[in-house]
Amino acid sequence: MENTIVIKLGGVASDNLTEGFFRQITEWQAANKKIVLVHGGGHYITKMMEALAIPVETKNGLRITNKAALEVTKMVLIGQVQPAITTAFQKRNISVIGLNAGDTGLLEADRLSDTDLGLVGKITKVKTNLIEQLLSENIITVIAPLGINSEHDWLNVNADTAACEVASALHAEALYLLTDVPGVKNGSEIINEIATAEIEKLQKTGVIKGGMIPKLASAAFAAENGVDQVIITNSLETIGTKIKSKVAIG
């Protein structure tokens, strides 16, 4: 969809919702840009799981999700994080609506082949009609990263992956993956640009590790599937690291 910008809010979503953030959103809307947000919630999910004495485990930067963890994830994302985000927009008189996989089967998903991860899925289809209808009315959509499979079972989905799938399905002009660091670092230095062909090498050499591994894999997917600009940063006001779809030289 022309003039669409997708933003993935970080695990501590409230950290991203600064006055500068809303100022940029307002400027984009004034320029007829359409805004879609996909939010994480890992920090709050972990806190709730610890409070309920549910073990917190990860593998390759992804949360291992059993039935108890999935119920907590749904509760926190839909009942806590998403309403906090939409309320922040409403306080500034910005039209917004929260959506999840239960809304007309918005995000269809299949379970990942790595069964060690449990009830974790990958988006297979984004039903864009509802999103596009809301965007045409200048309503910002805020989407929780949960999917539903063909048997109507809910699945936890990595928020970066969900944001990239949504951006690709909408043919967004830009995707911002907001995180807790100002870009991809090599030591203490921010890398300005990374070609998708360089990502595997950066992972093997240890430059990319932990949660940045699935984040960059998702960013590469978006860059190679129709999203013009893919940027990893901690703020809409920070340049961050641009992920480009091109072959590395040398």
UniProtKB/Swiss-Prot annotation:
NCBIfam families assigned: argB
InterPro entries xref list: AceGlu_kinase-like_sf, AcgluKinase_fam, ArgB, Asp/Glu/Uridylate_kinase
Pathway this chain belongs to: Amino-acid biosynthesis; L-arginine biosynthesis; N(2)-acetyl-L-ornithine from L-glutamate: step 2/4
Annotated GO MF terms: acetylglutamate kinase activity; ATP binding
Entry's Gene Ontology BP terms: arginine biosynthetic process via ornithine; L-arginine biosynthetic process
Gene Ontology CC: cytoplasm
Compartment annotation: Cytoplasm
Source species of the chain: Listeria monocytogenes serotype 4a (strain HCC23)
HAMAP family on file: ArgB (MF_00082)
Higher taxonomy: Bacteria, Bacillati, Bacillota, Bacilli, Bacillales
Domain of life: Bacteria
Top EC category: transferase
Pfam family, any one: AA_kinase
Name of the protein: Acetylglutamate kinase
Residues the record marks as site: Transition state stabilizer: K8, K215
